Amino acid sequence: MTDDGTWSDESDWELGPDDISDAIEEVSAPPPVVAVVGRPNVGKSTLVNRILGRREAVVQDVPGVTRDRVSYDASWSGQRFMVQDTGGWEPDAKGLQQLVAEQASVAMRTADAIIFVVDSVVGATAADEAAAKLLQRSGKPVFLAANKVDNERGEADAAALWSLGLGEPHPISAMHGRGVADLLDAVVDALPTISEVAGAGGGGPRRVALVGKPNVGKSSLLNRLSGDERSVVHDVAGTTVDPVDSLIEMDGKLWRFVDTAGLRRKVGQASGHEFYASVRTHGAIDAAEVAIVLVDASQPLTEQDQRVLSMVVEAGRALVLAFNKWDLVDEDRRYLLDREIDLQLAQLQWAPRVNISAKTGRAVQKLVPALETALKSWDTRVSTGRLNTFFKEIVAATPPPVRGGKQPRILFATQATARPPTFVLFTTGFLEAGYRRFLERRLRETFGFEGSPIRINVRVREKRGPKARR
């Protein structure tokens, strides 16, 4: 290995400074985010599919179909961006207006631009008007997509949507592609090169998301931490509407708990509450730096618990596992819980675990050290020289599996970014998923990273051809 951290046999491979800087920029610079919001059956998912040029989003906004918000990679006119499909829910007049407004509210915080889809045939509804009022105050570029415009009469229907106060409606047909190119031209022109919302909010109190499945004790814990007993907490999620964030002092330090309004609103009996909870959870995680995922220790781990944990890891946020209702856990349950953790959460052994009771206050003070540990790991950077020395020793002791009769080698390694720690490996061949997991384990053993996901990106380089004779 040379003084600059590269390995001596690297000269035979196509790897220059531009390769490294381009890879770092691609990994560390999050693309801008475009959120697609609107009522059920207005064509949101059809529009997303049209933007992507492939059929990926679920297109059935029918009763009983609920799902999470989903993000997709997209590109238009050379501009890469992420499309957030806010999905569908169970349509019901009782909760519809609130749910559409909820989409708009989350999009305002988590997107760089918003496409608001309205059915031009139906016209503006009360739910559309409520969402439009929110979007007017967002300060974000908002594009009004008047969908289902297939003829000149439809153009007139689209023009009527000026009444929403969001500027000129863009008449489109998501089904047939009419007008979508013009809409995307306008959207891309308004986008920043790099997302201004991903990981935004540097400085000030560290941002914490308190998330978990419904009725796991989030409101009780928030009240316990804040000393605020204004909220009446029952066996169903809910209370009154509070400001979006809560500043809470713990151990003499201010913490910003994001999106606490979602914890203080009674949604347990509302139509579409599963969708509402999913949108709120995604929004809180996106706005946070670290997430406390609350799990009911008195009950078996559920698919919902694992889904929330996956959201945190996929978003690249620091993580603290808090097992609540510990006052209800007896010896038998502790034994079963340990087995469940070993079997179902084996990939999250790096997350600090705190056993608490929001009801009695048991061990809640231990959350602060766990949060600080997770955030310190999340912020960690490893020098390039130290990293390459580490990988050279690891590969010498345990080389990657042979593929196609050839032994892949790691030419160079660098940490592209922190928050979360993201590493780029330039190699001579593909590294199997199992070997990547091995490298992650060894990285954790050597450098810690307790409480933070880490990411490993592999870039395979081509060998240079024979040099031309002079």
Swiss-Prot record:
GTP 1 binds at residues 38-45, 85-89, 147-150. SMART domains: AAA. The keyword Cell inner membrane does not apply. One of its GO terms (biological process) is ribosome biogenesis. The keyword Nucleotide-binding applies. Residues 32-195, 206-379 form the EngA-type G domain. Keywords: GTP-binding, Nucleotide-binding, Repeat, Ribosome biogenesis. PROSITE patterns: G_ENGA. InterPro entries: AAA+_ATPase, G_ENGA, GTP-bd, GTPase_Der, KH_dom-like, KH_dom-like_a/b, P-loop_NTPase, Small_GTP-bd. Associates with the 50S ribosomal subunit. NCBIfam families: GTPase_EngA (TIGR03594), PRK03003.1 (NF002828), small_GTP (TIGR00231). Belongs to the TRAFAC class TrmE-Era-EngA-EngB-Septin-like GTPase superfamily. EngA (Der) GTPase family. This is GTPase Der.
